[in-house]
């Protein structure tokens, strides 16, 4: 999670969300940060998954895990299910748009083709601090 946090661009106008994907030996396969300025689907998770499937030359990421600083939204949670990521680790809960524990609960719905192992609250305070600072600065 520290790697995902460190990859966030705190000077960007985008929400400070970072994601990394590692293989079963914890080797980093991809890393991404939110980049939605010109592409509304440019969430960190989506970009990290695109990069990982390109790097590995596969459609499914069976033996990989994703670390994300914020609970995935419905779009990202569905993509995590489709790509069969083995483990999902995330930092802060997203009480407004979160789709794992907070709201929609994608992995418990019929929309979910696969449910990863889910670990939440990883370095939660550090992840929340990124968000608080970002939105406090936007309100100035």
What spans do the regions from the language model cover?
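Zinc-dependent deaminase catalytic domain
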Residues: 1-140
């Amino acid at each position: 999670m520290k790697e995902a946090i460190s990859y966030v661009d705190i000077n960007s106008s985008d929400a400070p969300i970072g994601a990394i994907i590692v293989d079963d030996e914890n080797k980093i396969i991809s890393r991404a940060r939110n980049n939605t300025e010109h592409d509304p689907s440019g969430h960190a998770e989506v970009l990290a998954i695109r990069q990982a499937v390109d790097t590995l030359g596969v459609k499914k990421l069976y033996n990989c895990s994703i670390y994300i600083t914020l609970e995935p939204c419905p779009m990202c949670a569905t993509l995590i299910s489709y790509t069969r990521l083995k483990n999902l680790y995330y930092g802060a809960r997203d009480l407004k748009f979160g789709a794992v524990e907070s709201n929609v609960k994608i992995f418990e719905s019929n929309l979910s083709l696969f449910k990863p192992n889910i670990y939440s609250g990883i370095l939660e305070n550090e992840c929340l601090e990124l968000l608080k600072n970002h939105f406090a600065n936007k309100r100035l």
